[in-house]
């Protein structure tokens, strides 16, 4: 074979190897970014479940109790007691 044919084949092999390495690195970076986003979503879901849902429950329960007992208030004392 002619020497320039060997050079072209070697160049093709090297370029294929470089392209494969670049694709693998790009795939790893994308995987790391998607994993970080998934972790952030899981943390936000945990904060929602552990912090906000109980707070909304306590707030709604207290508000309902307040409105329920507003109807059953004792009357005000007479003016001469003051």
UniProtKB/Swiss-Prot annotation:
Protein's cellular compartments: Host Golgi apparatus membrane
Alphabetical list of Pfam families matching this protein: CoV_E (PF02723)
Membrane topology: Single-pass type III membrane protein
InterPro entries registered for this protein in UniProt: E_MERS-CoV-like (IPR044379), E_protein_bCoV (IPR043506), E_protein_CoV (IPR003873)
Intravirion side of membrane: 38-78
Primary subcellular site in the record, as a coarse category: host cell
Domain of life: Viruses
The UniProt record lists the keyword Transmembrane helix: yes
PROSITE patterns reported for this sequence: COV_E (PS51926)
Ranges that cross the membrane: 17-37
Leader sequence segment: none
Virion surface side: 1-16
UniProt keyword list: Apoptosis, Host Golgi apparatus, Host membrane, Membrane, Transmembrane, Transmembrane helix
Disulphide bridges: none
Biological process according to GO: disruption of cellular anatomical structure in another organism; viral budding from Golgi membrane
GO cellular component terms given for this protein: host cell Golgi membrane; membrane
HAMAP family named among the record's database cross-references: BETA_CORONA_E
Record-stated family: Belongs to the betacoronaviruses E protein family.
Function: Plays a central role in virus morphogenesis and assembly. Acts as a viroporin and self-assembles in host membranes forming pentameric protein-lipid pores that allow ion transport. Also plays a role in the induction of apoptosis.
Subunit structure, as described in the record: Homopentamer. Interacts with membrane protein M in the budding compartment of the host cell, which is located between endoplasmic reticulum and the Golgi complex. Interacts with Nucleoprotein.
Protein's recorded name: Envelope small membrane protein
Gene: E
